[in-house]
């Protein structure tokens, strides 16, 4: 996979491209449109559950575990032993069909991970993202300041300063992969576009990181089991 935009070390992000992964994302989009969207209804909880299940689709897992992607982590970011330190996350941000139009303001992902300083987020969209459509706005180079002043909320670590200069709206083709530092300042864009936009992300760390080892390989993510859910719907 070749870097087609950005510089991870200097700017905090890099976009990489691969024909095979783009083809795989086309299959995921077709599956989403054919099998997932028709199941949407007025029940927002059910809709959210449907969206979450796309993250468990076998082709989506193949995408984030592909040899091409893991090789790119090593080649471009120096992550020799990548491990997933969180689930694959869905971001459905075009409208309120799932009951949430996120529009998350400027924030950083590191406090929601809490793993190593070498962590990285791999993000992709299953539809092309162009200006004026919902997507991401990033502040290149902002990762070099480390953790900015902010507050941890239920939605993430939101920055105190929301009047930030130097931001740019990303344009990215479906299936291209954005590697992003967890310290990179970014926000989720909304728009008046009525069509849906769905992106997916997964967080990686380097198991060979000595600093993370000294911290006991901690992670902010936990696995929880609701042992009463089997009673619902009856």
Predicted regions and their residues:
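Short, conserved beta-strand element in jelly-roll/cupin
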Residues: 107, 114-131, 171-172, 179, ...
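Non-heme Fe(II)-dependent double-stranded beta-helix
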Residues: 1-106, 112-113
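Short acidic/polar capping segments at secondary-structure boundaries
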Residues: 89-96, 110-111, 118, 126-131, ...
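Short, well-ordered beta-to-alpha junction loops that form the rim of enzyme active sites
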Residues: 18-20, 86-88, 125, 141, ...
């Amino acid at each position: 996979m070749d870097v087609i935009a950005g510089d991870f070390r200097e700017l905090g992000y890099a976009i990489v491209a691969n024909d095979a992964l783009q083809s795989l994302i086309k299959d995921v989009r077709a599956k989403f449109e054919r099998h997932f969207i028709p199941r949407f209804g007025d029940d927002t909880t059910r809709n959210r559950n449907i969206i979450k299940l796309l993250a468990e689709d076998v082709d989506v897992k193949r995408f984030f575990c592909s040899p091409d992607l893991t090789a790119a982590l090593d080649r471009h970011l120096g992550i020799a032993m990548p491990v997933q330190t969180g689930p694959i996350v869905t971001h459905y941000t075009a409208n309120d069909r799932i009951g949430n139009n996120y529009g998350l303001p400027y924030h950083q992902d590191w406090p929601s991970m809490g793993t190593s300083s070498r962590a990285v987020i791999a993000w992709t969209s299953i539809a092309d993202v162009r200006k004026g459509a919902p997507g991401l706005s990033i502040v290149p180079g902002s990762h070099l300041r480390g953790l900015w002043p902010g507050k941890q909320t239920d939605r993430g670590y939101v920055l105190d300063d929301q009047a930030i200069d130097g931001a740019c709206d990303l344009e990215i083709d479906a299936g291209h992969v954005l590697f992003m530092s967890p310290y990179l300042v970014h926000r989720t864009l909304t728009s008046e576009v009525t069509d849906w936009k769905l992106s997916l992300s997964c967080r990686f760390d380097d198991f060979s990181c000595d600093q993370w080892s000294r911290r006991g390989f901690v992670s902010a993510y936990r696995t929880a089991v609701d042992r009463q859910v089997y009673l619902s719907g009856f």
